[in-house]
Each structure stands twice: as C-alpha cells, then as structure tokens.
C-alpha cells in the first residue's frame, strides 16, 4: 500500500525542510496542498526536494515545482470572472487577479493598492517570479491568458458582504478564512472544479497512491480532511479542524509534521 503524505504549508509545514528531504530520498511520497500560488510556494519550498506535483491555489493548479510548470489547472469561467470582479469594484476593492498564460507565465492584474498589505504583497513578489504584475484601469482577460484565481486580504467586515455576493455566482468556489500571520482575512475565488481535495485525488492517481495522510491547520483544510484516509491537525490548528482530526500532533513551530513523518513513514 502506497501512502501519499500531503500537507498544508502556512501554519503547518514551513519549518524544517531537511527532515522531510531525508524521508523523500527514502521513497516517501510527499507534497503540499496550499492556498499559495506557484510564485510564493516555489520560493518557500526551494529547500525541500518535492518531485510529486503540488496542489496550489486551493487546487487550481497541479504544479511541478522543480520545473516550474503546470501539470494541470482549472480556469474561472469568463462570465463568472466578470461577475466577480464587478462585485469587488462596486465596493471599491481592488483584488489581485491571477492569469496563467499559454507561455507558462503568470500575469497578476490589480487596479490600486487600498491597504499597506496590498503594496507589501506587490513589493515582495515584484520581479521575483515567472511573470509580471499589470496595473489596469479595469479588469480584463488578456489574449492567451486564463483567469485562475482572485484574491484579496482585508478586514472581516469588509470582505464578508463580498463573500456572500460572490457565493451566488455559478462556476466558482469562495474560500474565506483568517490569515495565519496578520489580523486580516483572505477571500479567494476560483473555479468550482478546484479544491484541495480534488487536487489531492488527482495527484493520488498520478503517483499511484492507495491512501492519503493529510496535515492541516485552517478552515480551508476541512475538505482535504474529508477525503483523507488519515488526517492530522497541528496543535496550533483552528478548533474546527482539530475536532475532525484523527490526531492532534505537535505545532508547526516545533516541526510537528516533520517529526510525525519521521515516526510514521516506513521506507
């Protein structure tokens, strides 16, 4: 029986890559499932030798981190794209809209920086990824580009009405949850065909695994847990996830996932 070990990143993994690498060298099937894009995930995971496709942007992408290319992806339907961006614009919000090009590069559209964290997002990534930011007067679908992800960080009260309205749009899934690192919340919108759970199933089929052992910390890991044969919440996970976990393991700051894998994996 082959087990695919699949972990969230923020608040769950992101600490000691060396311990995980040793297990991968010994044959462990390991990857990540995260809301992060290929842009930030590739940089943060550069010290972990992941050869199994990663599930990125909540399942929008199956992504080959080594070769920096998509194995598969789900795009937002055109009608849904314009309906969603209009909801944001009516409330004077400027989300970051991710496009994946036929050339394998990303374009991120935005109209303005409404909060310092939005400029910070831009500054930390500008010139550091395989693609470009594009400031626009209004959101548009560019030639040979496919809309895949719409994201905004803001206060709960600012985002909740947008979340409620966006959920009524066909063809998309809305993920709304608290940020691990700041007092803000994330609203992420993407194709309804995508989810961490669906992505995990696709990876499972690609690598010929029989079972999934999942690790997470936040509400956006609940669907992944519903699919997993074994599910483990780190000690710092939200109560909702700890309640449905088979076991609560060490917190992320103490390398909870890596330490668990060392004990659990048998080459």
Regions found by a protein language model. Name each.
Residues 16-121:
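Active-site phosphate-binding/coordination module
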Residues 1-4, 15, 186-267:
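Mg2+-dependent phosphoryl-transfer enzymes with acidic/Ser/Thr/Gly-rich catalytic loops
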Residues 8:
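Active-site residues of response regulator receiver
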Residues 26-31, 51-52, 148-149, 210-211, ...:
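Short active-site oxyanion
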Residues 105-215, 219:
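Conserved acidic, metal-coordinating active-site core of Asp-based
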Residues 26, 48-50, 58, 168-170, ...:
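Short, structured coil segments at secondary-structure junctions
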């Amino acid at each position: 029986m082959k087990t695919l070990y699949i972990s969230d990143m923020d608040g769950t993994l992101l600490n000691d890559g060396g311990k995980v690498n040793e297990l991968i060298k010994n044959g462990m099937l390991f990857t990540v499932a995260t809301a992060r894009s290929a842009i930030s995930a590739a940089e943060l995971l550069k010290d972990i030798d992941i050869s199994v496709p990663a599930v990125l942007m909540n399942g929008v992408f199956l992504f080959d981190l080594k070769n920096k290319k998509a194995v598969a992806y789900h795009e937002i339907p055109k009608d849904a794209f314009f309906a969603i961006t209009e909801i944001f614009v009516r409330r004077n919000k400027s989300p970051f809209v991710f496009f994946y090009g036929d050339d394998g590069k990303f374009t991120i559209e935005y109209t303005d920086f409404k909060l310092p964290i939005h400029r910070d997002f831009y500054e930390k990534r500008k010139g550091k990824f395989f693609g470009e930011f594009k400031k626009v007067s209004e959101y548009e679908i560019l030639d040979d580009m496919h809309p895949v992800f719409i994201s905004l960080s803001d206060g709960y009260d600012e985002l909740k009405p947008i979340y409620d309205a966006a959920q009524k749009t066909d063809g998309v899934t809305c993920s709304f949850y608290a940020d691990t690192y700041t007092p803000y919340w994330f609203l992420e919108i993407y194709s309804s065909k995508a989810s961490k759970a669906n992505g995990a199933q696709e990876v499972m089929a690609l690598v010929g695994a029989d079972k999934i052992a999942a690790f997470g910390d936040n509400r956006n890991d609940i669907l992944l847990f519903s699919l997993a044969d074994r599910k483990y919440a780190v000690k710092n996970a939200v109560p909702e996830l700890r309640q449905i976990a088979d076991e609560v393991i060490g917190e992320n700051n103490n390398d909870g996932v890596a330490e668990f894998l060392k004990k659990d994996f048998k080459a």
